[in-house]
Structure formats: structure tokens, C-alpha cells
Swiss-Prot record:
ATPase subunit of a proteasome-like degradation complex; this subunit has chaperone activity. The binding of ATP and its subsequent hydrolysis by HslU are essential for unfolding of protein substrates subsequently hydrolyzed by HslV. HslU recognizes the N-terminal part of its protein substrates and unfolds these before they are guided to HslV for hydrolysis. CDD domains: RecA-like_HslU. This is ATP-dependent protease ATPase subunit HslU. The gene is hslU. Keywords: ATP-binding, Chaperone, Cytoplasm, Nucleotide-binding. One of its GO terms (biological process) is proteolysis involved in protein catabolic process. SUPFAM superfamilies: P-loop containing nucleoside triphosphate hydrolases. A double ring-shaped homohexamer of HslV is capped on each side by a ring-shaped HslU homohexamer. The assembly of the HslU/HslV complex is dependent on binding of ATP.
Length: 457
């Protein structure tokens, strides 16, 4: 289903509710931010350029839905979306990735997105062209009496009568799969022989490395070779080749750059890891502040150089998130705080939320396991009491060890179904019911022993 970016906030909220339990405040904020992007596009030109997106900072412990909200939002908006960890960046001048690299990566994703859309649009034409090329190989236009060409035709076929009607008959045979066992010889492009180039050094070198690699690829022309393969394989190869020919890369690049600038979304995870704790200004704190100062112009609005052209970041939406266990949002430099005007606090998840997470979303964990085991002919069913027991144990383990939110459910459910998953393919009974007692039998010892649960759950 194609989702339009002109969804109303209520419609966006309803879509997010299908996959994410709770966190109404965070979902409202991103729904409004998405609608504001559409509103900006309707504003007349002079004022439109002045309207900047209202960046969001989401505060909450791990496993409460911060990343999932941003990811689902991007799919709803059909926007280029990239998730990066702020802690992976280093200050300009140090070894590591600089902050501009996330914009370059965003452009690459946008190009891939637009190119895939264009390929879907021209897929029918590319397949028709590939069919024509296959038929030309099976039905040469002029009679050739060499052994190789005779082998390609059925014994009863008359090569000299290969007119349009014969070609159409063969086309139908090709589509019906009657020629699947035939072999044809096609010209395929060999993989590039250009040497791999790696530039080691300070940050900002990744774009230079990419440019050097492209230059080497152009210096070494692509080689082709004759390859013998069956008709279906040849059809796949030729369809891809025809798609590459038909895709207008100039249009793709232009549209990708436009989408990056106008509707790109950058999710900055672990923003709290680059916050200076308590205003300290020495040692690693200096480097953290340096990363913040490098982030500032990008979030503020800057022009980033990429190998496809210049990209303005003025209208890219930035969504930052962090647990802020040690540092606080106020520990970020004031200028960066000002660039994230919307702050949303996500609530910790308890037993009730865990029960809902296991049952309500369309991609709920229990539904995933039911579908997986159905492939082995096993009908899996969870009793309500079993769901409650799983949620209770997940909460207990979170409280006694590390708090990892809903991610704990993956570990607990996997442990509960460990024996069944191993024996499913050899089971004689087709139905399996997970009861509360079964959950306790599988987990009681581990959940009670804190040392064990620390390592297993």
C-alpha cells in the first residue's frame, strides 16, 4: 500500500498505532512534524524557503520505541531516511567519520530509492525488450546452417519462415515456460577490474575515496564475455541490462537531490553520548563538544558537498534521541538545544504495555512465531495467561538486571519456544498450545537466578 505524505496527523497516528504501542505524545509530535512538511509545500515560494522544520528530540530509555517511531514515520512519508549514531562521529581533524558523511549517505539512499521507483515504472518495457533479444537469439533473421544455430531451434522449426507470426508464437511459448530448457549464448558484462582504493587518514576522506574509486572504474573499461545459459536466466540478465539502459540517471540524480533537501529525515541516535556531563571542559569532554559544534551547522542549515552535487540541509528533518541517564538535554551546547525545539519524553514500559506489544501490533512477536512455525505444519497458539506470564517475567528481569524495554520480550519468547523451535520439523502433533505453566517451566529457574538471567535473559 502506497502511503501519501499528505496524511493528516490523525491518519499518521492511526498508521503508527498499527505497529507501536503507547507513546502517544511522541507519535503526536512526529505526526505534526510530517504534516507541517506537507503544509510548507503548499505555501507560496518566497515564504516557503523561510519555514524550517521543527526538529525533535526524544528522551527515553532503550527499548521504548524511539527508533521504531522514526523508522515508521519515514516509510509513511516515503522519504529518504537514515539512522546514525551520534557517538560514532569524531571532531573534524580526528580519525573517524565526520558529520557530513551522514548527508552523503542520505543522498545515496535517495538515489537508490528513486532508481528503484524508476525501474518499477519501466519494468514492463525492459521485459519486452529482453524478450525480443531472446527471440532474436532463438530465431535468427537470416538462415544459418551451422550446427550451433540448428541446436537452438526445435527439430520441426523452419528458420526461413521466422516471420512476425512465428515470432509471436515463440513469444507465447517463452511466456508459458515451454522454452525454459533451451540454452542461448548472451553477452554479459564482467565485474569491474578496477583496483580497490582505500584512503586512510582524517575524517572527511570517505567521499574522496569514493571519487577516486569512480575515477579508477572509468579508467578500466567494462569487459564483456559470451556466456551460455538457460532461457530464464538469460531473460533475467537481459531484463536488468535493459533496465540500466532505460533508466534516465540524470533525472534520477536530480529527483534524489530534491527529495534529500525537501523531505530527508536524519535520525540521530545516542545524542546523549556527545553531551558534556556537568559542564566539564577537558579530556574526552572537549571531543564531545567538538562533535556537537560540527553537528550544529548541519542541523542549522548548511551546504554539503557530495559527488552528485551540493546539498542544502536547511529543510532536512532531524530527530534526535537518547536515554539521558547520566547527561541531561541541558548538557548539550545551548546552540544545539535551540535547534531541537520539540522535546518529547517517552514513558518506560510496564507489564500492561508488554502484554499489548505481544498481541496488538500487526507485526507482534507472537504473530511472527505463529507464522514461522506454520511453515513446519505446526499450529502455535498462546493462551492469554501465557502472554501475561511472559510479560511478568520480562518486567522482573528488566528490574533485576539491565532495563532494555521491549527488547527483553524477544529474548524471553525465544527462550520459551526454544525446545519447540528445535523439534518442530519432527513433531507428530500439529497443534501446540503455550500455557502459563509451560512458560514457568521453561523460565522459572533462569528468571529466579539473577546470575543466570543476567547472561541468558
Amino acid at each position: 500500500m502506497t502511503i501519501s505524505s499528505s496524511l493528516t496527523p490523525k491518519e499518521t497516528l492511526a498508521e503508527l498505532d498499527r505497529y507501536i504501542v503507547g507513546q502517544a505524545a511522541a507519535k503526536r509530535s512526529v505526526a505534526i512534524a510530517l504534516r507541517n512538511r506537507w503544509r510548507r509545500q503548499q505555501v507560496p515560494s518566497p515564504l516557503r524557503e523561510e519555514i524550517a522544520p521543527k526538529n525533535i528530540i526524544m528522551i527515553g530509555p532503550t527499548g521504548v520505541g524511539k527508533t521504531e517511531i522514526a523508522r515508521r514515520l519515514a516509510s509513511l512519508a516515503q522519504s529518504p531516511f537514515i539512522k546514525v549514531e551520534a557517538s560514532k562521529f569524531t571532531e573534524v581533524g580526528y580519525v573517524g567519520r565526520d558529520v557530513e558523511s551522514m548527508i552523503r549517505d542520505l543522498v545515496e539512499l535517495a538515489i537508490s530509492m528513486v532508481k528503484d521507483e524508476e525501474k518499477k515504472r519501466i519494468e514492463g518495457l525492459a521485459e519486452a525488450n529482453a524478450e525480443d533479444r531472446i527471440l532474436d537469439l532463438l530465431l535468427p533473421p537470416t538462415p544459418v546452417h551451422s550446427e550451433s544455430s540448428v541446436d537452438l531451434l526445435p527439430a520441426s522449426a523452419d528458420v526461413s519462415a521466422a516471420g512476425s507470426s512465428t515470432k509471436e508464437k515463440f513469444r507465447q511459448m517463452l511466456r508459458d515456460g515451454k522454452l525454459d530448457e533451451r540454452e542461448v549464448e548472451v553477452e554479459v558484462t564482467e565485474t569491474s577490474q578496477a583496483p580497490m582504493v582505500e584512503v586512510m587518514g582524517v575524517s572527511g576522506m570517505d567521499d574522496m575515496q569514493s571519487n577516486i574509486q569512480d575515477a579508477f572504474s572509468r579508467m578500466f573499461p567494462k569487459k564483456t564475455k559470451q556466456s551460455k545459459m538457460k532461457v530464464p536466466d538469460a531473460l533475467d540478465v537481459l531484463t536488468k541490462e535493459e533496465m540500466e539502459k532505460l533508466v534516465d540517471m540524470e533525472m534520477v540524480l536530480k529527483e534524489a537531490l530534491r527529495r534529500t533537501e525537501q523531505s530527508g529525515i536524519v535520525f540521530l541516535d545516542e545524542i546523549d553520548k556527545v553531551a558534556s556531563k556537568g559542564g566539564s571542559s577537558h579530556g574526552p569532554e572537549v571531543s564531545r563538544e567538538g562533535v556537537q559544534r560540527d553537528l550544529l551547522p548541519i542541523v542549522e542549515g548548511a551546504t554539503v558537498s557530495t559527488k552528485y552535487g551540493m546539498v542544502k540541509t536547511d529543510h532536512i528533518l532531524f530527530i534526535a534521541s537518547g536515554a539521558f541517564h547520566v547527561a541531561k538535554p541541558s548538557d548539550l551546547i545551548p546552540e544545539l538545544q535551540g535547534r531541537f525545539p520539540i522535546r518529547v519524553e517517552l514513558e518506560s514500559l510496564g507489564k500492561d504495555e508488554f502484554v499489548r506489544i505481544l498481541t496488538e501490533p500487526e507485526n507482534a512477536l507472537t504473530k511472527q512465531y505463529i507464522a514461522l512455525l506454520a511453515t513446519e505444519g505446526v499450529t502455535l497458539r498462546f493462551e492469554d495467561e501465557a502472554i501475561e506470564e511472559i510479560a511478568t517475567i520480562a518486567v522482573q528481569v528488566n528490574e533485576s538486571t539491565e532495563e532494555i524495554g521491549a527488547r527483553r520480550l524477544h529474548t524471553v519468547v525465544e527462550r520459551v519456544l526454544d525446545v519447540l523451535s528445535f523439534d518442530a520439523c519432527e513433531r507428530e502433533e500439529s497443534e501446540f498450545v503455550v500455557t502459563a505453566q509451560y512458560v514457568r517451566d521453561q523460565l522459572s529457574e533462569i528468571a529466579e537466578d539473577q546470575d543466570l538471567s543476567r547472561y541468558i535473559l
